[in-house]
């Protein structure tokens, strides 16, 4: 398993991490993702560690905290072999301060995460969403306090706008606070919006991308394709209408291209879609999920090989989409935006 530096930091992370959204199934939303218990989680974690996947991503809202509890139980005796990333910011209760990136919420949220995980520190704490109501200075001063207290090692954001990430980095630089070294983002062959604004920012500022839902909300498994809708009662059918809007014909073009590459390489469609991401600049880590060992091993098979230039070009062309303004305008003046 290759390791990459996470942004400008000295922290090295495996190119794949394991997402725990399938742990617990503690409410209707997460039951649809999975309901892995502590025993099943322990087996999946052992498989991950055997294959070099030594980073585990979770969040306080996953199954109302149950995912963190199960992860904590499953890693007992293994803590020194792995990295934990978790996320806070979204609603965890009905109180007026049970959400957001305020000092009040962050300190309480981190303490509760540590209790559920049964650990003394979090390797990477990410703000799960952009809080435009709390002053960035307050948020970063609090994160600085948590780092100095030894409760958190590194910080990052998730689902931020470009302006908010840049403002956060500027405030950190001004006051000497820890910088966001990671940005957990939605990115796949089906959803390439990250490339327009956030990728150039990440490259310029040294922010490593951690990719969530790398199979496009489950659309890039090969189970949904032209003339072959997912069978009723299957997970592929259940998620067919979920997630961000997408153009169906574009999805089918991408699947057709993946089929061509699969025939050439002998790799599965998910493996190819994941491998394409691993080759993208600024991507430090791709978060995979699995509800059973076979699915996990198949996803890990995305590593250890590379797409050819021709195969990569085929996938790039099939998945291309017109960018939003001002990116389409900037592309009309390539002499002003030459690659470094």
Range-by-range predicted roles:
Residues 21-23, 59-61, 87-91, 127-130, ...:
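Active-site beta-loop-alpha junctions enriched in small/polar residues
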Residues 6, 18, 41, 56, ...:
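Conserved, mostly hydrophobic/aromatic
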Residues 27, 93-197:
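Glycine/proline-rich, positively charged
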Residues 2, 42, 204, 228-260, ...:
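Terminal-tail/helix-coil boundary detector
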Residues 1-82, 148:
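N-terminal binding-site loop/beta-alpha segment at the start of enzyme catalytic domains
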Residues 11-16, 51-55, 78-82, 119-123, ...:
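Short, well-ordered coil/turn segments that N-cap beta-strands
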Residues 45, 68, 72, 110-114, ...:
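Generic structural signal for well-ordered alpha-helices
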Residues 194-234, 268:
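Aromatic-lined glycan-binding groove of carbohydrate-active enzymes
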């Amino acid at each position: 398993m290759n390791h990459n530096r996470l942004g400008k930091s000295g922290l090295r992370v495996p190119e794949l991490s394991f997402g725990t959204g399938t742990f617990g199934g503690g409410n209707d939303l997460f039951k649809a993702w999975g309901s892995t218990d502590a025993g099943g989680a322990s087996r999946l974690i052992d498989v991950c560690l055997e294959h070099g996947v030594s980073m585990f991503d979770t969040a306080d809202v996953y199954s109302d905290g149950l995912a963190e509890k199960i992860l904590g139980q499953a890693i007992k005796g293994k803590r020194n072999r792995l990295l934990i990333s978790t996320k806070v910011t979204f609603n965890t209760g009905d109180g007026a301060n049970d959400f957001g990136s305020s000092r009040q919420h962050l300190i309480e949220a981190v303490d509760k995460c540590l209790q559920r995980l049964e650990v003394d520190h979090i390797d990477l704490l990410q703000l799960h969403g952009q809080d435009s109501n709390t002053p960035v200075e307050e948020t970063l001063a609090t994160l600085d306090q948590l780092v100095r207290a030894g409760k958190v090692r590194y910080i990052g954001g998730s689902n931020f706008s470009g302006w908010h990430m840049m403002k956060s980095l500027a405030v950190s630089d001004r006051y000497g606070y820890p910088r966001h070294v990671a940005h957990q983002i939605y990115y796949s062959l089906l959803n390439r919006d990250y490339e327009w604004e956030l990728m150039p920012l990440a490259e310029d500022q040294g922010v490593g991308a951690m990719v969530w839902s790398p199979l496009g909300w489950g659309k890039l498994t090969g189970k949904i394709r032209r003339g072959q809708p997912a069978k009723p009662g299957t997970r592929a059918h259940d998620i067919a209408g979920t997630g961000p809007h997408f153009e169906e014909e574009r999805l089918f073009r991408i699947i057709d291209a993946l089929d061509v590459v699969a025939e050439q390489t002998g790799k599965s469609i998910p493996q190819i879609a994941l491998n394409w991401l691993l080759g993208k600049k600024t991507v430090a880590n791709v978060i995979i999920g699995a509800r059973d060992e076979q699915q996990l091993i198949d996803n890990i098979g995305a590593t250890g090989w590379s797409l050819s230039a021709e195969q990569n070009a085929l996938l790039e062309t099939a998945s291309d989409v017109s960018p939003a303004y001002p990116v389409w305008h900037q592309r009309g003046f390539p002499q002003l935006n030459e690659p470094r």
